From Swiss-Prot:
Keywords: Aminoacyl-tRNA synthetase, ATP-binding, Cytoplasm, Ligase, Nucleotide-binding, Protein biosynthesis. The keyword Nucleotide-binding applies. This is Leucine--tRNA ligase. A motif ('KMSKS' region) lies at residues 636-640. SUPFAM superfamilies: Anticodon-binding domain of a subclass of class I aminoacyl-tRNA synthetases (SSF47323), Nucleotidylyl transferase (SSF52374), ValRS/IleRS/LeuRS editing domain (SSF50677). It comes from Cupriavidus pinatubonensis (strain JMP 134 / LMG 1197). Its EC number is 6.1.1.4.
Length: 873
């Protein structure tokens, strides 16, 4: 055993050992030493995109998973911790454009490097189950299930709106549109309607909403999904009109439909707004160039809901009017840039008195504001919006004719009934959730397995011809999808008639790849999409990932699972029983700003920080030139702010165990973690102390095998077993920061117990090593072997978890505070089971009392059991 802790040597030796014994290959239905089948536990981190290098967020995520897996394995579980790569997507195409390499080559190189980094972290990953979503063996099942959905009507084709770059001749993602222009060409982006494929996720909306209740997920994630699914109970009704189209027929049968959850405010409607693509807008713009220009502007805007919520609300009158169904009044129709044709009927009613958005819109364009809801004692003013204007809990109808005095529920019921009797409306449930458009006009993704034939139309690729393999040698040049220009891929024969035909060149949304990879981990070599091994492991017991995936990935994975269930492929309703969303890793930011307002960000490693007496930063200078930089505050580590820490550099300098220990100790897993260089140094010092204790006490620890502890060891054993009890609790509730704190207390106790017997040192240090092992497996493995524990208990991987000795926690004596005339003067030691009389006797006989009593007998002795004794003289 080396006297000095050398992380690189210790970690290399441990990793070579684990590799030699294939330590992390996990079978199904494993049995324990007693011959009984172990309970399974499937713990999985969200698979990474192979961007090139791990970042500290990866390190934290995977270490949380690894700690959990190792702890559960030592406690008798059959634990699966797999890993794979979310390998399709736009970043690979962008890298290809920048570097002139095929996305496939870039992706596979990155996978190889990142896998090597993960292995250097000592993660307990079963690499025999590795999956890359860009592998034809994987994405063939994306294609297969898509065809099954097509057969069942779950997948269908319709036109959808996309961002079109007319210069690069390509479709852009929303994030590639910057101020209305293409990110690469700078061309003004157009909105185009093109045929796309959709999945009917809305058919599962009710189940997706209801099943959230049974999941062990953070409440805020459930709420985010609930809001995204967006169940609304309201009334859909029509404003009638007599507006005719060019064909002489009434547009939309003379009805403008809207949906509202606030039917009680219907008498306050002063305008209606329609989407730019609405037939009434198109009709009105035919002879109105100004309106046509505004509609064109709307069509060039974003269709993302997040953007719609924050952008300036604009509108223009159409000159058209519709008839209010209950009052008969004429209501002006406007085109609004905030109304989407893809949502509901592409039209909304405007009630500015009781809707904040409508209130702002009406004030901007000087539209009437009519109050029809009153909350007692609240004066109404059109000058500024007040929260009570939209209050449906306490408001009652006013200025609403027969509905006056009705509260929200009663008014909605009465108005819905009247509209229904007129044949103009009905109560209805609507959903914010929309069907999932999966077509992407991009190259690096799963090919959609369809063929276009001039004679037969759209024809599915026969199952025996799957997978439709994506050519991996294409290099995008930014001018459209390269699949459209590759005859090897494009040209084929129609499976139905045999005539020349063309393959579909759209690829699938990459969220499809991440919908079910965790199932393929369970059976990566299966000849079918999944097999019986998936039934054994799924549903997953613990999923770990960032809060940024709370909606789309998790929602799509839940939907995909339910489709697989309905197709008879799986036997469960939900894929992830429990979810942990780890907090972000933060770091300081520093920058300089030029005259034009452009900021240049500097990495914290390149900056010297000046602090005050309390350690608070008061200034900073760049090391390169000594000139000041601005302290930008603490933010999430990111490339854009240049405040990341390279995990590989950290591992090279301090070792993987130090990196693991710091990210586990610095904060609870679900909370944000603020980077601290001094914290890393502290973690490194602690590990050196652990090693030094093992080296200094090696002979005693080895000699302590087989003997029994002595009475003199009681204090040490009581401390260690008490801390062990708390550590067990903290492991179970995934509070790994306090687990690390527990091991620090254990080490302090061991170092302080100078006279402990060899047997106590062996027992207590062995407990420390096992409790610490899931967090820092390399150093603990090295000490475990060097000190002879492996001979007694076997490999630390599967060593039995230490059991709390309840007997060791029992105190034979307790120390009570001693007061004299109400003032603390010392303490008195009494047997733990001493009664009141015995405590009084011990206190009266103490030297401290004798000193203050000066021969006088106590007047009274007050005992607070277990805490203090007060002697009144």
């Amino acid at each position: 055993m080396q006297d000095k802790y050398l992380p690189s040597a210790v970690e290399q030796a441990a990793q070579q050992h684990w590799q030699a014994i294939d330590a992390y290959r996990v079978p199904e239905h494993a049995t324990g030493p007693d011959g009984k089948e172990k309970p399974k536990f499937y713990a999985c981190s969200m698979l990474p995109y192979p961007s090139g290098k791990l970042h500290m967020g990866h390190v934290r995520n995977y270490t949380i998973n690894d700690v959990m897996a190792r702890y559960l394995r030592m406690n008798g579980n059959n634990v699966l911790m797999p890993m794979g790569w979310d390998a399709f997507g736009m970043p690979a195409e962008n890298a290809a454009l920048n570097n002139g390499v095929a996305p496939a080559a870039w992706t596979y190189d990155n996978i190889a490097y990142m896998k090597k980094q993960m292995q250097s972290m000592g993660l307990a990953i079963d690499w025999s189950r590795e999956v890359a979503t860009c592998s034809p063996d994987y994405y063939r099942w994306n294609q297969w299930l898509f065809l099954k959905m097509l057969e069942k009507g779950i997948a269908y084709r319709k036109t959808g709106t996309v961002n079109w770059d007319p210069v690069d001749q390509t479709v852009l993602a929303n994030e590639q549109v910057i101020d209305g222009r293409g990110w690469r060409s700078g061309a003004i982006v157009e909105k185009r309607e093109i045929p796309m494929y959709y999945l009917r996720i809305t058919d599962y909306a009710e189940e997706l909403l209801g099943d959230l209740d049974g999941l062990g997920w953070p409440e805020r994630v459930k709420i985010m999904q609930q809001n995204w699914i967006g169940k609304s109970v309201g009334v859909r009704f029509a404003f009638k009109h007599d507006i005719e189209g060019d064909d002489g027929q009434l547009i939309n049968d003379g009805k403008l439909y809207v949906f509202t959850t606030r039917a009680d405010t219907i008498m306050g409607v002063t305008f209606c707004a329609v989407a730019a693509e609405h037939p009434l807008a198109t009709h009105a713009a035919a002879n109105n160039p100004e309106l046509a220009a505004f509609i064109d502007e709307c069509k060039h805007g974003s269709v993302m809901e997040a953007d719609m919520a924050t952008m300036e609300k604009k509108g223009m009158p159409t000159g058209l009017q519709v008839t209010h169904p209950l009052t008969g009044e004429q209501v002006d129709v406007w085109v609004g840039n905030y109304v989407l044709m893809s949502y509901g009927d592409g039209a909304v009613m405007g009630v500015p008195a009781h809707d904040e958005r409508d209130f702002a819109f009406a004030n901007k364009y000087k539209l009437p504001i009519r109050q029809v809801i009153d909350v007692k004692g609240q004066p109404y003013s059109t000058e500024a919006w007040q929260e009570w204007y939209g209050d449906k809990e306490n408001g009652v109808c006013i200025e609403s004719g027969k509905y006056n005095g009705l509260g929200y529920l009663a008014a909605v019921e009465a108005i819905a009934a009247d509209l229904g009797a007129m044949g103009l409306g009905e109560k209805k449930i609507t959903w914010r959730l929309r069907d999932w458009g999966i077509s992407r006009q991009r190259y690096w993704g799963t090919p959609i397995p369809l063929i276009h034939c001039d004679s037969c139309g759209v024809v599915p690729v026969p199952e025996q011809d799957l997978p439709v393999v994506l050519p991996e040698d294409l290099v995008p040049d930014g001018t459209g999808n390269p699949l459209n220009k590759d005859p090897r891929f494009l040209q084929c024969s129609c499976p139905s008639c045999g005539k020349p035909a063309r393959r579909e060149t759209d690829t699938m949304d990459t969220f499809i790849d991440s919908c079910w990879y965790y199932m393929r981990y369970t059976c990566p070599d299966a000849a079918t999409m999944v097999d019986a091994r998936n039934d054994y492991w799924m549903p997953m017991d613990q999923y770990i990932g960032g809060i940024e995936h709370a909606i789309l990935h998790l929602l799509y994975a839940r939907f995909w699972t339910k489709v697989m269930r309905d197709l008879g492929l799986v036997k469960f309703d939900e894929p992830f029983t429990n979810l942990l969303t780890q907090g972000m890793v933060l770091n300081e930011t520093f920058y300089r700003e030029d005259a034009a307002g452009k900021k240049t960000w500097y990495n914290p490693a390149d900056v010297d920080v000046q602090t005050d007496d309390r350690g608070r930063p008061v200034g900073a200078t760049l090391k390169a030139d000594g000139q000041p930089v601005v302290i930008g505050g603490v933010e999430k580590m990111s490339k854009s702010k240049n405040n990341g820490i390279d995990p590989q550099a950290l591992i090279d300098q301090h070792g993987a165990d130090t990196a693991r220990l710091f990210v586990m100790f610095a904060a609870p897993p679900e909370q944000q973690l603020e980077w601290s260089g001094s914290g890393v140094e502290g973690a490194s010092r602690f590990l050196r102390r652990v090693w030094n204790y093992g080296f200094a006490n090696a002979a005693a620890v080895r000699d302590g095998a087989g003997a029994a502890p002595t009475a003199d060891d009681a204090d040490l054993r009581r401390e260690i077993h008490g801390v062990l009890k708390q550590a067990n609790y903290d492991y179970q509730r995934i509070q790994y920061n306090t687990v690390v704190s527990a091991t620090m207390k254990m080490l302090n106790a061991l170092e302080d117990a100078k006279n402990a017997s060899p047997v106590a040192r062996r027992e207590c240090f062995g407990i420390l090593l096992r409790v610490l092992y899931p967090v820092v497996p390399h150093i603990t493995h090295g000490l475990w072997d060097a000190l002879g524990y492996a001979t007694q208990y076997g490999d630390l991987l599967d060593a039995p978890w230490p059991q709390v000795d309840e007997g060791a926690l029992v105190r034979t004596e307790i120390e009570m505070v001693l007061q004299i005339n109400g003032k603390v003067r010392g303490s008195v030691t009494v047997p733990a089971d001493a009664d009141r009389a015995a405590i009084e006797t011990a206190a009266a006989a103490s030297e401290t009392v004798a000193k203050f009593a000066e021969g006088k007998a106590p007047k009274k002795i007050v005992v607070v059991p277990g805490r203090l004794v007060n002697v009144v003289l």
